[in-house]
Amino acid sequence: MFSVLVADDEKAIRESIKDYLEAKGYSVKTATDGESALELFYENSFDLVILDVMMPKVDGFDACRAVRRASNLPVLFLTAKGQEADFLKGFECGCDDYVVKPFPLSVLYEKCNSLIKRYKGIDSANWLKVSGVALDLSCKRAYVG
């Protein structure tokens, strides 16, 4: 099971991402601002961090920089800021992908899978997916969702 940290100050977005990813077999912890996201990041082990850019206390850009100083963990920005300058600033901070709101949850899920697989070095040839069940043939584990 993959573990994801989702930080967004909008409750509806946090909850919809959490519910969707958990239904797909992920473990998800959420934060309402960048400061609490960094606390969770330092206290837990995650496979991916999803950050909103505009959050109270510590914004997503600063949170991404802090994550990047401590880890090479994939970071995905999820934000309403969709101008070219925002994209460039996000990538300069060290993010691995950038999704503009509104977004389909199915696309976010596939981006999460892609980033985590690349980070963990998971070869898709070692995976078998059938009817909502994924088998990791390399370690003989099954994931439902």
Locations of the language-model features?
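Charged docking surfaces used in two-component/phosphorelay signaling
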Residues: 15-23
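Active-site residues of response regulator receiver
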Residues: 8, 52, 79
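The feature encodes the CheY-like receiver
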Residues: 14, 56, 83, 101
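Short hydrophobic/Thr-rich beta-strand motif most characteristic of the beta2 strand and flanking loop
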Residues: 25-32, 40
